[in-house]
Amino acid sequence: MVLLLNCIVAVDQNMGIGKNGYLPWPLLTNDFKYFQRMTTSSVKNKQNLVIMGKNTWFSIPEKNRPLKDRINLVLSKKLKEIPHGAHFLARSLNDALKLIEQPEFVNKVDMVWIIGGSSVYKDAMNYSSHLKLFVTRIMQSFETDTFFPEIDLKKYKPLIEYPGVPSNTQEEKGIRYKFEVYEKNY
C-alpha cells in the first residue's frame, strides 16, 4: 500500500506552534473548523487516522478526547499502556505506519494525518513518502517555545490551489491568516 501522509499545523511568522503545551493564540474558530473538516473527511466506511505525540494528546481537553470520527493513535516511547480514550499506541512514527499496513487497518483507514507535535512533524517530513503539508500561516508573531520544522522549498512545492482549501486571507479576533498546501513527492 502506498502511504499518503498529511501534516496539518498552524504556525506563526516564526514557525512557532505552541507555548507551554498549548496554542499561543486565541482559538480561531474557522481554522478549528478547517482542521476538523480536513481530518474527518473520508471515503464511505473508512475513517482517517490522526497520529500525535503524547504531549499533543494530553493538550487536548479530556472532554474532547479522543478526537471524534477519527482513529486516534498516540506516539510515545515512555507510555506502557494506551492513554485513556486513545485507540492505539506506538513507539515511533515508523512503528505506527507499519501497524496501519496490517490487513485489518487497510480496510478501515482512509487518510493519515499527523497533528503534532514538533518532533512528530519532523519525523514525518523526513519520512520517505509522498507528503502534503496543510499549513495555517498566522500573519503575526506570538510568544512560543515549540516550533514547526522549516519547510525546504527544494523538497516541497507550494500548491496554488487545492480542493476544499480557501485561498483568500482570513481574519478572526484581529488575527489574519491564510491556508497553504505544500507537496513533497518521492
Curated annotation (Swiss-Prot):
GO terms for biological process: dihydrofolate metabolic process; folic acid metabolic process; one-carbon metabolic process; tetrahydrofolate biosynthetic process. Its EC number is 1.5.1.3. It comes from the Viruses. GO terms for molecular function: dihydrofolate reductase activity; NADP binding. NADP(+) binds at residues 10, 16-22, 54-56, 76-78, 116-123. It holds the Pfam family DHFR_1. Gene3D superfamilies: Dihydrofolate Reductase, subunit A. Pathway: Cofactor biosynthesis; tetrahydrofolate biosynthesis; 5,6,7,8-tetrahydrofolate from 7,8-dihydrofolate: step 1/1. InterPro entries: DHFR, DHFR-like_dom_sf, DHFR_CS, DHFR_dom. Substrate binds at D31, F32, K33, Y34, F35, Q36, R70. It catalyses: (6S)-5,6,7,8-tetrahydrofolate + NADP(+) = 7,8-dihydrofolate + NADPH + H(+). Belongs to the dihydrofolate reductase family. Key enzyme in folate metabolism. Catalyzes an essential reaction for de novo glycine and purine synthesis, and for DNA precursor synthesis. This is Viral dihydrofolate reductase. The lineage of its organism: Viruses, Duplodnaviria, Heunggongvirae, Peploviricota, Herviviricetes.
